[in-house]
Amino acid sequence: MNQNSDTTHGQALGSTLNHTTEVTRISNSSDHFEDSSSNVDESLDSSNPSSNEKASHTNEEYRSKGNQSYVPSSSNEPSPESSSNSDSSSSDDSSVDRLAGDPFELGENFNLKHYLRAYKDSLQRDDIITRSSGVCMRDHSVYGVGSGYEFLKTFPDIFLQPYRAITEKQVVEKAILSHCHALANAGELVMVLGQPGSGCSTFLRSVTSDTVHYKRVEGTTHYDGIDKADMKKFFPGDLLYSGENDVHFPSLTTAETLDFAAKCRTPNNRPCNLTRQEYVSRERHLIATAFGLTHTFNTKVGNDFVRGVSGGERKRVTISEGFATRPTIACWDNSTRGLDSSTAFEFVNVLRTCANELKMTSFVTAYQASEKIYKLFDRICVLYAGRQIYYGPADKAKQYFLDMGFDCHPRETTPDFLTAISDPKARFPRKGFENRVPRTPDEFEQMWRNSSVYADLMAEMESYDKRWTETTPASSEAPEKDNFGSDISATTKHELYRQSAVAEKSKRVKDTSPYTVTFSQQLWYCLARSWERYINDPAYIGSMAFAFLFQSLIIGSIFYDMKLNTVDVFSRGGVLFFSILFCALQSLSEIANMFSQRPIIAKHRASALYHPAADVISSLIVDLPFRFINISVFSIVLYFLTNLKRTAGGFWTYFLFLFIGATCMSAFFRSLAGIMPNVESASALGGIGVLAIAIYTGYAIPNIDVGWWFRWIAYLDPLQFGFESLMINEFKARQFECSQLIPYGSGYDNYPVANKICPVTSAEPGTDYVDGSTYLYISFNYKTRQLWRNLAIIIGYYAFLVFVNIVASETLNFNDLKGEYLVFRRGHAPDAVKAAVNEGGKPLDLETGQDTQGGDVVKESPDNEEELNKEYEGIEKGHDIFSWRNLNYDIQIKGEHRRLLNGVQGFVVPGKLTALMGESGAGKTTLLNVLAQRVDTGVVTGDMLVNGRGLDSTFQRRTGYVQQQDVHIGESTVREALRFSAALRQPASVPLSEKYEYVESVIKLLEMESYAEAIIGTPGSGLNVEQRKRATIGVELAAKPALLLFLDEPTSGLDSQSAWSIVCFLRKLADAGQAILCTIHQPSAVLFDQFDRLLLLQKGGKTVYFGDIGEHSKTLLNYFESHGAVHCPDDGNPAEYILDVIGAGATATTNRDWHEVWNNSEERKAISAELDKINASFSNSEDKKTLSKEDRSTYAMPLWFQVKMVMTRNFQSYWREPSILMSKLALDIFAGLFIGFTFYNQGLGVQNIQNKLFAVFMATVLAVPLINGLQPKFIELRNVFEVREKPSNIYSWVAFVFSAIIVEIPFNLVFGTLFFLCWFYPIKFYKHIHHPGDKTGYAWLLYMFFQMYFSTFGQAVASACPNAQTASVVNSLLFTFVITFNGVLQPNSNLVGFWHWMHSLTPFTYLIEGLLSDLVHGLPVECKSHEMLTINPPSGQTCGEYMSAFLTNNTAAGNLLNPNATTSCSYCPYQTADQFLERFSMRYTHRWRNLGIFVGYVFFNIFAVLLLFYVFRVMKLRSTWLGKKITGTG
């Protein structure tokens, strides 16, 4: 038996699920765009038709054996159980035969059941203990806080919050789950059913004891006698909660994602002498084969923003990763979402197989589950508003509610029927039972507690408790080590369970540790994962490398070849300041990165894969080589271009402090992200930190000039110590030749150096050089002996910050779990909501805000059918027929030609509801996008016609498109969103009042009156899934689409009742005359009956069927059965049947080409003839419409009206998202005060004038975080425009750009003014200047234009960038570039000749010159004692006599303070601040010119926004259509 092999990787099928808890890994090798060729139909023990038999009697054979694991029979014979399950297909026989050969073969005939039995055989042979567990949860209640409703908080509410916190009644504690029970023996499957908000997710979390985020939890839970506290402490990896959302590192491939989970849970006691690497590889291939993912091994998992595997494949990656962690008890929260019915069945069937063979216990919530899936479960739990109304055998659940008095539709599936019980509008009592059935959750719960099924459950729980909590000593006869039979005692079970877990742990892992591998192994695995994440993201690596190289070349050329003289003394400080600041601040993006991966780390932490500290340390380590390379390139280029101290020691010291400074700041930003609860607060503190770091590094203002109230900040700034050491390294033991001695000019050439001085602070009289060490001490108070002391301090800061990050990662567990709640505008909420918010109200379910007493305070829709029918009569009735023929769609992927649609044809007519179906990846959404003219890449060929004529520019405006993703402006109310659509999409000839009246009709039709004034928001904070879907449909209906309504997966993610409600609504729309084409994923038989026609696609975008469905799908079923398909059972679901027939599913295949069957069928010929007839009838018709000018226009409304509507909506969006405005306001006020009091009350000394220069400079640098704050909102609005509004031609892109620019102006003026006041008056710019009112007004005016400048600059950058992250990088790069040439860091006179043009080109030259020259013009300079230059005159002359010629003939001469002295002449280099500004080429006389030029730059930016938006967002869309070949016949 292999005990060690502690190399790198892991084990098989999750040690086959904890040596009873892991199933399925990965194995395929084709690109994920291709059809999978692996056949896993027979890999699933219930995938054959006969397997339904086994499922129907819910595995009684297994349950009759209690917890006894399967004991394999001879490997050469099929087991009796196998025979009893009637798996009698020939393929099954061949699988059994193959068991005698290589049972671990993962070929095309792979059989999961046989694999697992062979695997258990090998465990027995190697004497490996396995473990399994059941669960008993008794009287469990979960409480949270919140009413389920909130009032919208606008910007002013931030200031009113303290008052309302006092006056408004505090929200009371609410019950999410109330006195629920759960019991599952090892190896059982439990389905949890209920409407959204019933508490299903909370129930699953409770089963896995994942309840730390709730307010309070009551009740007891144990796992075969192991207390939940002990289970979470010692065996947390045995409990899995797999959430609904797919949370992964998007840059990792599928194989890398699964490998990592398997490595971290690889047991030490592996069967068959497998090494860790062999184990991990086998696990990966096994899980992937079971879930049909092998072809995605080398494809990135991706996410909504990173292209990767498809949505259905990503869901399967989530499931596979869960299996790789080897849980004994797994809870799967709506894990079938996004999967087609066949793939969903395959997933649950794998759970069934693992339950049977490995005793893995699973709880599953699933929406729209099929009958076939339902039959695989042992127990059913039904929840109603947090109340448990049934928990018992699956085969008794339906009858329980039938006996209660409810009726079930003949073709309604059992899961749909059970879910409908909790919906008052969907449940139907039988005749005579109307007043006898329960109505409220309390009544249902009470009836359940009085039932015999409840009594049976209590008796079974009592027996379970007695069995697994007894303390009888273990039997003297040792039980089998690979099973926990029903005859063993609780003590023996617990000891064996502990032994099994301990045996899996690597050496040096404590027996009580929850982790499987050592910390060093965890660290190694995390290092490998971090490396893979970097390598798989070449765009990030490339952008960072480019940024470092670009900046080094720019700065190096600006400060090119500095001389060892006093002219470049100031410039050397500028180079060193920029070097360390730039390298350090490149880590600012770490904040966003840390928050993006926080949910992933939390998920892995819950599964005990690794210490979070291992990930913290690994990410810091992996970052080092990339930082080393980037800073190496930066240092080499910049150091030698600028001619810094050219010694080996000087260069390596420079490099060392840049590297350690950047590394320390990376740890600072990471630790900041680790201790903050959300990204907004971390980013705000990060922005403030950047400002403090930049100011207190020591270059902008020497620390000795900072007031005592802020001076301590410098000692918290690691870069201050780094900058000090860089300055010491550069200046120590060096003498800088004086470029010009004072006095100079005619008559002074013959005087010796002894009578002159260098005009530099710290210069000694009578010397022609400046000593570097003295300069540092006099100017900065730097002492050369502190160089290496500073290194130790920075390392100490780094160690402390890493420690903080590690402690935060291990101890802090931020509450990211929020219940769903509606948000209403104040004064517009229903009365019940006002009561719920202001008075505590009724107990509401925090998952959706439903009244836990059974009502729903937001459902007040009228039930008057007659009234609703009148509203349907107002729907625009269509008369046009949309048809397409021979439609092909080709794209290029990595240079390879792919055809996504292949010769598709069909038509949609008014009054008919047409379904578009197919498995995942068949091209449903692609076809919908092509038909709706919404694809922007590739080549489309074929005919798309309206009434036999080609499409015109009005097509998109006259159609509605309901996207699968509900894309909205989250801050709009439902009514506002519909009014916006109606106002801009209905013809201009229709009065606005009439448009709004129609909106009210649509709201009534969709039964949205009760939440019409609710904010759409985001999922969790706003409308729930069904409400958002209704709002999306409403937005399209409000436009009165005269031609066609497209809908993409309108029922995706909805429970069965919500899906039924949506489809019934579509049915009524079609009956009212609307033409509808709708894709649908998992329709039940009843749902499917609502459709008139079907277009069925198979992989490759090939048509399998198009035509009528027929009553009860008879026409459709007859077609397939007449062409050789097996007969569809009378109680079967036709939608599932046709998908099974054509081989849909992740692992399914078919031996027949149904596309070829269709092409050769009479039905296809009939459709072609029908298309010819339709087109001919319209082409021959004399009644051809002549569209008016209004009808022919691309947009329904004029540009001015578009701008008005979009601007109003954007302003509302800003006003209703107070976090954006508050962060902007807080940054302006805080930064203004911070800079103001840092440079507080500057006097008239030379250093004071320079400090004022940097005070102005820092005021302009503030634009960087402000731009970073406005770009995400701009991109958010732009994404809505691009995804939904632009394709529908709602309004012009010009309207979008102008509205985005205009809406920023009032906020910039108000907040900019507040910054100006907080910045201007503490520095006391107004002191000592003439006409302070005029100059203050000028400075304010120029700064207000600067507010407009940076906002339009940021919008221009955002227009060209795909996302906010990229925009932030580009923005920082460009902003740094333009701000570098303004003459502050390097005066224009010192610039290399090549760059002089850039000084004149950058707008910051005119901004800073305008502000500073205005604010210091005419100020007298009063040198302080250390700023005075001491000159010794020749013997016999007074200071005045000696200096008179110099002072008279030189306009730039300073001020001589003691003209009568004969020694030690005190000379101040400047008389006025204007002379100081001349050094930077700044003049007061340019101020109005500067204002005019800067205003010109503002208008240039506006033009740039328009141009870049057109080039990157509009022209791109249009240019791609040039590649399309779409023909028409009209």
UniProtKB/Swiss-Prot annotation:
<keyword id="KW-0812">Transmembrane</keyword>
<dbReference type="InterPro" id="IPR003439">
    <property type="entry name" value="ABC_transporter-like_ATP-bd"/>
</dbReference>
<feature type="modified residue" description="Phosphoserine">
    <location>
        <position position="489"/>
    </location>
</feature>
<dbReference type="GO" id="GO:0140359">
    <property type="term" value="F:ABC-type transporter activity"/>
</dbReference>
<feature type="compositionally biased region" description="Low complexity">
    <location>
        <begin position="36"/>
        <end position="48"/>
    </location>
</feature>
<dbReference type="GO" id="GO:0042626">
    <property type="term" value="F:ATPase-coupled transmembrane transporter activity"/>
</dbReference>
<feature type="region of interest" description="Disordered">
    <location>
        <begin position="843"/>
        <end position="864"/>
    </location>
</feature>
<protein>
    <recommendedName>
        <fullName>Brefeldin A resistance protein</fullName>
    </recommendedName>
</protein>
<feature type="transmembrane region" description="Helical">
    <location>
        <begin position="791"/>
        <end position="811"/>
    </location>
</feature>
<dbReference type="InterPro" id="IPR003593">
    <property type="entry name" value="AAA+_ATPase"/>
</dbReference>
<keyword id="KW-0813">Transport</keyword>
<feature type="compositionally biased region" description="Low complexity">
    <location>
        <begin position="72"/>
        <end position="93"/>
    </location>
</feature>
<feature type="modified residue" description="Phosphothreonine">
    <location>
        <position position="1186"/>
    </location>
</feature>
<feature type="transmembrane region" description="Helical">
    <location>
        <begin position="1300"/>
        <end position="1320"/>
    </location>
</feature>
<feature type="glycosylation site" description="N-linked (GlcNAc...) asparagine">
    <location>
        <position position="1449"/>
    </location>
</feature>
<keyword id="KW-0677">Repeat</keyword>
<dbReference type="GO" id="GO:0046677">
    <property type="term" value="P:response to antibiotic"/>
</dbReference>
<feature type="domain" description="ABC transporter 2">
    <location>
        <begin position="882"/>
        <end position="1125"/>
    </location>
</feature>
<keyword id="KW-0547">Nucleotide-binding</keyword>
<dbReference type="InterPro" id="IPR029481">
    <property type="entry name" value="ABC_trans_N"/>
</dbReference>
<feature type="compositionally biased region" description="Basic and acidic residues">
    <location>
        <begin position="54"/>
        <end position="64"/>
    </location>
</feature>
<feature type="transmembrane region" description="Helical">
    <location>
        <begin position="575"/>
        <end position="595"/>
    </location>
</feature>
<feature type="glycosylation site" description="N-linked (GlcNAc...) asparagine">
    <location>
        <position position="1175"/>
    </location>
</feature>
<feature type="glycosylation site" description="N-linked (GlcNAc...) asparagine">
    <location>
        <position position="28"/>
    </location>
</feature>
<keyword id="KW-0325">Glycoprotein</keyword>
<feature type="glycosylation site" description="N-linked (GlcNAc...) asparagine">
    <location>
        <position position="450"/>
    </location>
</feature>
<comment type="similarity">
    <text>Belongs to the ABC transporter superfamily. ABCG family. PDR (TC 3.A.1.205) subfamily.</text>
</comment>
<dbReference type="InterPro" id="IPR013525">
    <property type="entry name" value="ABC2_TM"/>
</dbReference>
<dbReference type="InterPro" id="IPR010929">
    <property type="entry name" value="PDR_CDR_ABC"/>
</dbReference>
<feature type="binding site">
    <location>
        <begin position="918"/>
        <end position="925"/>
    </location>
    <ligand>
        <name>ATP</name>
    </ligand>
</feature>
<feature type="transmembrane region" description="Helical">
    <location>
        <begin position="620"/>
        <end position="640"/>
    </location>
</feature>
<comment type="function">
    <text>Confers hyper-resistance to brefeldin A (BFA), an inhibitor of intracellular protein transport. Could serve as an efflux pump of various antibiotics.</text>
</comment>
<feature type="transmembrane region" description="Helical">
    <location>
        <begin position="1492"/>
        <end position="1512"/>
    </location>
</feature>
<feature type="transmembrane region" description="Helical">
    <location>
        <begin position="1220"/>
        <end position="1240"/>
    </location>
</feature>
<feature type="modified residue" description="Phosphothreonine">
    <location>
        <position position="491"/>
    </location>
</feature>
<dbReference type="InterPro" id="IPR034003">
    <property type="entry name" value="ABCG_PDR_2"/>
</dbReference>
<dbReference type="Pfam" id="PF19055">
    <property type="entry name" value="ABC2_membrane_7"/>
</dbReference>
<feature type="region of interest" description="Disordered">
    <location>
        <begin position="1"/>
        <end position="100"/>
    </location>
</feature>
<feature type="transmembrane region" description="Helical">
    <location>
        <begin position="649"/>
        <end position="669"/>
    </location>
</feature>
<dbReference type="InterPro" id="IPR043926">
    <property type="entry name" value="ABCG_dom"/>
</dbReference>
<keyword id="KW-0067">ATP-binding</keyword>
<feature type="modified residue" description="Phosphoserine">
    <location>
        <position position="486"/>
    </location>
</feature>
